[in-house]
Swiss-Prot record:
Pyridoxal 5'-phosphate binds at residues 107-108, 189, 217, 237-239, 277. Interacts with ISD11. It comes from Trachipleistophora hominis. This is Cysteine desulfurase, mitosomal. Its cofactor is pyridoxal 5'-phosphate. It comes from the Eukaryota.
Length: 441
């Protein structure tokens, strides 16, 4: 059976999708269960649960319901064994030891525990602390940084270039004697930019600074090796990799040992770092999702890349002046192709979303989608407010089909042309008027 990257996307027949993509029955079931009239293109916000993951979880809701911390009977032993199996499945995907995996409620909690926990531990001696991050991190990381600033920590927010990538030399210059932590995400949730983690980790190790990575958008999609990348803390989400919502994990390096102050008190579960009864069904789901990614990551990536290129090519060929936000670099990889962020000048992003009401799209992070403010990520790239307001994020995933790519390209092209026809500014630009020279009153 040919793999997705061996198929010319222009020749892919929709009716043959199942035979080209997977022979697995669960994949076919997942595709068949989706409503044809609605198309899901928001895989950065969340992913559907893979049928194989659901099958693994179900027994722990109904039959194997023991508390994994109850060690006096077989119900508890059974659940504990399932949790430890999942712990190893997660660890294997990032090249870690299973004892380095702490289960949490999701990447937001993992980020908070990593950042606040590490800084609080370092600050116990009363010395000043300095933390480095970037201007394009997820909101939960930026809010954690502001929390630390209110407590007296000094925080440096590094700028990024037009592709969303940090300057490694600037990172070196930013590290000072009181720097205790560098927190930089692996893949950006809005533009898909991939940061040079191995180089960042090397710098941090040389300067004896902890390196935390928010890998919510990277885990299970791109190769991660925490030892090769010298990552000390790594945040993981379950629902971004076709697992359940409400579960995640934090990798915490053991050698040399990374010390954290827990966020809250309780029974001392998870090595005393995260108290509370573990949700066995959700953890089993996270473990199974990680195991599936371990087997199919490269196949998924090849498939997603082929569909992403097809969509981008179709839109560029049929819509004038389409701007790609973020990098297109593939060697080394600086962009995850499942996250395609495009700007359509003279088209309001919110208006385009309304015009494409049968397609699940986003104009930015799901956590800030209720805000009408322009994306702070796009503004950090140097885009003005108008361009930032005209952006749409196309999310492509494991279950996306060529038929959906074709339909999304068709509907987007039609909607953009219709909205531009209603724009007097676009009409003026088409007539050769340089809008930047006009003095508006």
């Amino acid at each position: 059976m040919p793999l997705p990257n061996q198929i010319a996307t222009s020749n892919v027949e929709t009716k043959n999708f199942a035979s080209l993509k997977r022979s697995d029955e669960p994949i076919a079931i997942a595709q068949a269960s989706r409503t044809p009239a609605k198309i899901y293109f928001d895989f950065q916000a969340t992913t559907p649960v893979d049928p194989r993951v659901l099958d693994a979880m179900l027994p722990y809701f109904t039959k194997k319901y023991g508390n994994p911390h109850s060690r006096t009977h077989s119900f508890g032993w059974e659940s504990e064994k399932a949790v430890e199996t999942a712990r190893k499945q997660v660890a294997d995907l990032i090249g870690a030891h299973e004892k380095e995996i702490i289960f949490t409620s999701g990447a937001t909690e993992s980020n908070n525990l990593a950042i606040k926990g590490a800084v609080d531990w370092k600050a116990q001696d009363g010395n000043p602390v300095h933390v480095i991050t970037t201007q394009v991190e997820h909101k939960c990381v930026l809010d954690s940084m502001r929390f630390l600033e209110e407590k007296g920590a000094r925080v440096t927010y590094m700028k990024v270039n037009k592709d969303g990538v940090i300057d490694l030399e600037e990172l070196k210059r930013s590290i000072s004697d009181d720097t205790v932590l560098v927190s930089i995400m692996g893949v950006n949730n809005e533009i898909g930019t991939v940061q040079p983690l191995e180089e960042i980790g090397k710098i941090c190790k040389e300067r004896n600074v902890l390196f935390h990575c928010d890998a919510a958008q990277m885990f299970g999609k791109l190769k991660i090796d925490v030892n090769k990348m010298n990552i000390d803390l790594l945040s993981i989400s379950g629902h971004k990799i076709y697992g359940p919502k409400g579960v995640g994990a934090l990798y915490v390096r053991r050698r040399p040992r990374v010390r954290l102050v827990p966020l809250f008190s309780g029974g001392g579960q998870e090595r005393g770092l995260r108290s509370g009864t573990l949700p066995t069904p959700l953890i089993v789901g996270l473990g199974k999702a990680a195991a599936v990614c371990q087997e199919e990551m490269q196949r998924d990536l090849s498939w997603i890349e082929s569909l992403s290129k097809k969509l981008y090519t179709c839109l560029k060929e049929n819509i004038p002046n389409v701007i790609k936000n973020g990098s297109l670099q593939t060697n080394p990889l600086r962009w995850f192709p499942g996250c395609l962020n495009l700007s359509f000048p003279h088209v309001e992003g919110e208006g385009l979303l309304m015009a494409l009401k049968n397609i699940a799209l986003s104009s930015g992070s799901a956590c800030t989608s209720a805000s009408l403010e322009p994306s702070y990520v796009l503004r950090a790239l140097g885009n003005d407010d108008e361009l930032a307001h005209s952006s749409i994020r196309f999310g492509i995933g494991r279950f996306t089909t060529p038929c959906e790519i074709k339909e999304v390209a068709k509907q987007t092209t039609s909607a953009v042309k219709k909205l531009r026809d209603m724009s007097p500014l676009y009409e003026m630009e088409q007539e050769g008027i340089d809008l930047k020279t006009i003095k508006w009153t």
